[in-house]
Amino acid sequence: MYTILVVDDSPMIVDVFVTMLERGGYRPITAFSGEECLEVLKTTPPDLVLLDIMMEPMDGWETLGKIKTDPATRGIPVLMLTAKPLTPEEANEYGAFIEDYILKPTTHHQLYEAIEHVLARRHSITADIERAREAGIDPRIIDEYERLSKGVDINRRLLKILETTYSIKDA
């Protein structure tokens, strides 16, 4: 059972996501602010973080930055969860640090698909890395492979979000 940290400053929204995750067979844990999220990560590292963007005083982007600059937490995948459409500037600035971007409101199917996609990609890359290490491939090449594999997939997903949000394909 995967543990997922839900971070949102609205207790009602946290409750909704906790219920959805429990019904999906996940083990949710919660935080109600960016600071609380960082504290929870120190004691109970999850398999994945669902992080709201529009929180105060520390918003989700700042919280994401702190997660990704801490060596102890940088490897934890983060899905941004927000009612705010992704802007091209945000995709460019934060795309390398997030695993996916989920717009609220969302359905349980969309949530589960995003979570499973991230976890499956993570397992696939981890297996590839293990095989590469066993084959004696240079660790620098392995690190670059990991970075590029994740980046290509995330950029495809962000591109799809931007195309949908801004009707780019219909223009």
Label each PLM-derived region with a short phrase:
Residues 15-23:
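Charged docking surfaces used in two-component/phosphorelay signaling
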